[in-house]
Every structure is written in C-alpha cells, then in structure tokens.
Amino acid sequence: MLKQESNDIGSGENNRARPCDTCRSNACTVYCHADSAYLCMSCDAQVHSANRVASRHKRVRVCESCERAPAAFLCEADDASLCTACDSEVHSANPLARRHQRVPILPISGNSFSSMTTTHHQSEKTMTDPEKRLVVDQEEGEEGDKDAKEVASWLFPNSDKNNNNQNNGLLFSDEYLNLVDYNSSMDYKFTGEYSQHQQNCSVPQTSYGGDRVVPLKLEESRGHQCHNQQNFQFNIKYGSSGTHYNDNGSINHNAYISSMETGVVPESTACVTTASHPRTPKGTVEQQPDPASQMITVTQLSPMDREARVLRYREKRKTRKFEKTIRYASRKAYAEIRPRVNGRFAKREIEAEEQGFNTMLMYNTGYGIVPSF
C-alpha cells in the first residue's frame, strides 16, 4: 500500500524525531509492519481506516528514547517504550538498571492507533498484574485476539507482586509449592500403600507413641504363619510391651518385645517360642526343601558307580540260561489230558465219538486197547 522512502538524515539531525513517511511534516508515532512505514497519528487514522484489510495491519509505537525505531520492550520501572538498541544501552549502564523488569510489546491492530493508545497502556499494565491476564480488546476481531493470546502465551513471563506492589523476586515459588504438594501427596500415597500392605500381611501397625497392644490372628496354620514371618521382616525399631489377643478375646500378657532383641512383630505365639528372634538378612527367604529335588539328587550316580553297574550287568548276561519255565502247572496238566486230533486239541463231541468207537473195539476183540495220545 505504502512505499517506504529513504530518509537521508545527516549527523546533525540524529537527535530529531523521524518524520512521517506520508506527510513528512509531523513526527512519526506509529510503525506499521505490513507497510514498513512510520506514520503520524493523523496519517495512521487515515490510512488504516480505509477498509477492513487495512485495519488489521499490526502497528507498534515508536521508541520514546530515539524516536527513530519501532519499540520492542516496555520498561515497567521507567514506564517507557524502547527499541532493542535503546533497551540494551539503557539497561546495561549499571546493575540497578539491569534489574528493571521489561516485557515485549505486542502489535496492535484497529482503525486508529490514537483511539487504541489508552487500551494499549491498560493491556500492558494488565500483563504485569498477577491477578489478571492479558486483556485483548474486542475491536481487534477474532484473528487479532487469537494472535495476541498465542504470542502472550510464550512471550510474557509470570510476574508476582505482593500487596505493596513490590516484586518479591521468587519466580519459582509456585513451582516450589507445587513440588512440595506433590511430595506430600506421594508420601501419603506411599504411607497408605504400606499400611494396606501391612494389613494384608497380618502385620499390625505401630504408632510409635507409648505402649500399645498388638492384635494377633491365630486362624492360619503353624507352617503358613512361620512362612509369612520369614517373608516379612521389616527393620522397625521400637520398644514397648505388647499385649496379645487370641480368637476368644482373652489377653496374653506374657509376650514382651524389646527394640534391641527383635526387628519384626511376631504374628502368633505358635511360631514364637522365645522373646528373642535372630534377624535374617534382607531379601533372604528360607524355603522348605522340595522332596522331588531330593529324589533327583539321590538317583544321580557318579561315573564310578555307573561303571560298576555296567560290569555287573555284563557278567550276569554271560551266565544267563535260556530255559523254558512253566508259569502255570495246572494248565499244563490239563493240556496233557485233553484229547488231540492230529496234534491239535479236539472238541468234546469228537472225543465222545472216539470213546464210543474204542468201546466197541474192546467189546469185539475181548481185550482192551490202550489208546496213545
């Protein structure tokens, strides 16, 4: 829209403000990024109110120190808008100036920059107010509102002030408090999980304050209780007299636990024979030997035993006798008396016919014939 023209300013004119690029009569007060032009108030209102596209141009005011460059930072201590060169020059003069808090200046869009000057000052003050956030004028439109919020989300730091409007200098206070709350919640969570684990393992909780009674459960068997006692041995040092409860509600006052003698609360009197218990190292659990593993270790032979067995087997094989053994003598005797036909066992009918034939022969001949089987 506008074309920036070069301004040849001599060394003697460096102290004067830069003139407007349009009228060249008034000092410039606004810099338009879209047109790359320095404009005065009247020219800015005339140019950027022509149409809606021109009203969306982003403009910033000119540096209040040199009045020859667009302002980039707002110094809260000096309440001045400075360009990059003037900001580095002013705030590097002494250590006190380095502590001034500066915030970037956002471009402003609208029909007239002069009508938005008050809004711009209010928005800059709101940026540094801890109880408010960045205020975006509704006249900027949806696009300007979105851009301003996006830039403010990563450009503007969070500044904290106390009631006397003084900077407390602790920018990490909120993060530190959040960290403390997180640690306390994690400690509470760990304590809750630990107490629940103790309840599940039948280990009574201790309050570490004075004498207390320790309820014990006797529903489990002796072996299971001993196993649980070996698995859960915590390094808890305490000294007090324990009072034991059984299932019937009776109290057993005979058990006394000392902080120098034991480091774990016993679960029942069935596994506790004396008041002192040897403390086992952490992470060690005594397991009962497996019978199957014992049998496997017994059946495993050494090479010498195996060689001796092989030799005995070979000697026994040399003297082996291949004889026919009779397993059932009664069956053998019955088989011998059964009739046979051509070497095979005959049926009862054939046997009866042969017996009748033999009887007839004996009657005819007058003497008996001994049959041969």
Swiss-Prot record:
Q: What is its main location?
A: nucleus
Q: Name one GO cellular component term.
A: nucleus
Residues bound to Zn(2+) 2 are: C63, C66, C86, H91
Q: Which residues form the CCT domain?
A: 306-348
Q: In which tissues is it expressed?
A: Expressed in leaves, shoots and shoot apical meristem. Detected in the vascular tissue of the hypocotyl, the cotyledons and the leaves. Restricted to the protoxylem and phloem in young inflorescence stems and to the phloem only in older inflorescences. Also detected in the vascular tissue of the root.
Give the induction note: Expressed with a circadian rhythm showing a broad peak between 12 hours and dawn. Higher expression under long days.
Source superkingdom: Eukaryota
Q: Indicate, by first and last residue, each region the UniProt record lists as having compositional bias (Polar residues).
A: 109-120
Q: Which GO terms describe its biological process?
A: cell differentiation; far-red light signaling pathway; flower development; regulation of flower development; response to far red light
Q: Which PROSITE patterns match?
A: CCT, ZF_BBOX
Which function does this protein serve? Transcription factor that acts in the long day flowering pathway and may mediate between the circadian clock and the control of flowering. Plays a role in the regulation of flowering time by acting on 'SUPPRESSOR OF OVEREXPRESSION OF CO1', 'TERMINAL FLOWER 1' and 'FLOWERING LOCUS T'. Also regulates P5CS2 and ACS10 (involved in proline and ethylene biosynthesis, respectively). Regulates the expression of NAKR1 by binding to the 5'-TGTG(N2-3)ATG-3' motif.
Q: Which family does it belong to?
A: Belongs to the CONSTANS family.
Please describe the quaternary structure of this protein: Interacts with ADO3, SPA1, SPA2, SPA3 and SPA4. Interacts with MRG1 and MRG2 (via MRG domain). Interacts (via B-box) with MIP1A. Interacts with AS1 to form a functional complex regulating FT expression. Interacts with NFYC9. Component of a red light-dependent nuclear complex made of PHL, PHYB and CO. Interacts directly with PHL in the presence of PHYB.
User: What is this protein called in UniProt?
Assistant: Zinc finger protein CONSTANS
Could you tell me which species this protein originates from?
Arabidopsis thaliana
- Lineage of the source organism? Eukaryota, Viridiplantae, Streptophyta, Embryophyta, Tracheophyta
The gene name reads: CO
